[in-house]
């Protein structure tokens, strides 16, 4: 199964992950997860990239979004790690239009935390469980956070961009 294979690819590179940063650098009281930017030699996860490219083309045809690039990384939240309330594209400054999270871990229980908490355009909050093999897509300007995880939580986080990625 694809999800299992990409999970194994992620885990095989876990020693290469680095502390995730925000614009101001590594700030552990805002973000404590670890990431590894996807590289062309990651052949299994490259299929995820291709799927997002096809999805981007469909969005462009339907909504004229002008998506040109995909920026993505593996993300690992160890027990006790989180990402505080933020927007992936504050004030439409960085070209990120659609955010995507694809959950890679093999199993998940509701009491393990690690939920994505997301505020919609009407101000309503939604809690999304990080279920294995689930993909979540949302507008990058929406306020959201990752609640404290009690177990290792793995994902591919991606952004569909209207400009060239900065990494």
Q: Where in the sequence are the language-model features?
A:
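Non-heme Fe(II)/2-oxoglutarate
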Residues: 1-61
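Short, conserved, surface-exposed binding loops centered on an aromatic residue
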Residues: 29, 61-66, 89-94
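Conserved short histidine dyad/triad with adjacent acidic residue
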Residues: 42-45, 74-93
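A structural signal for well-ordered alpha-helical scaffolds and beta->alpha junctions
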Residues: 49-56, 67, 97, 153
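A short coil-to-beta-strand element that immediately follows conserved catalytic motifs
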Residues: 65-73, 112
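Short, hydrophobic/aromatic-rich beta-strand segments within well-structured domains
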Residues: 73, 99-103
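Catalytic core of Fe(II)/2-oxoglutarate
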Residues: 90-91, 96, 105-167
């Amino acid at each position: 199964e694809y999800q299992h294979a990409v999970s194994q690819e992620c885990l095989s590179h876990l020693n290469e992950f680095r502390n995730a940063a925000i614009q101001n650098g590594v700030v552990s009281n805002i973000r404590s997860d670890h990431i590894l930017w996807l590289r062309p030699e990651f052949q299994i996860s490259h299929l995820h990239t291709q799927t997002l490219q096809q999805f981007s083309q469909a969005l462009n045809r339907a909504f004229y979004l002008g998506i040109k690039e995909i920026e993505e990384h593996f993300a690992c939240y160890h027990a006790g790690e989180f990402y505080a309330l933020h927007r992936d594209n504050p004030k439409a400054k960085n070209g990120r239009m659609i955010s995507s999270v694809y959950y890679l871990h093999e199993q998940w229980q509701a009491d393990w935390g690690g939920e994505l908490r997301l505020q919609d355009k009407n101000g309503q909050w939604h809690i999304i469980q990080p279920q294995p093999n689930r993909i979540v897509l949302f507008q990058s300007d929406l306020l959201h956070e990752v609640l404290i995880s009690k177990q290792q939580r793995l994902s591919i986080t991606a952004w569909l961009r209207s400009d060239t990625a900065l990494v």
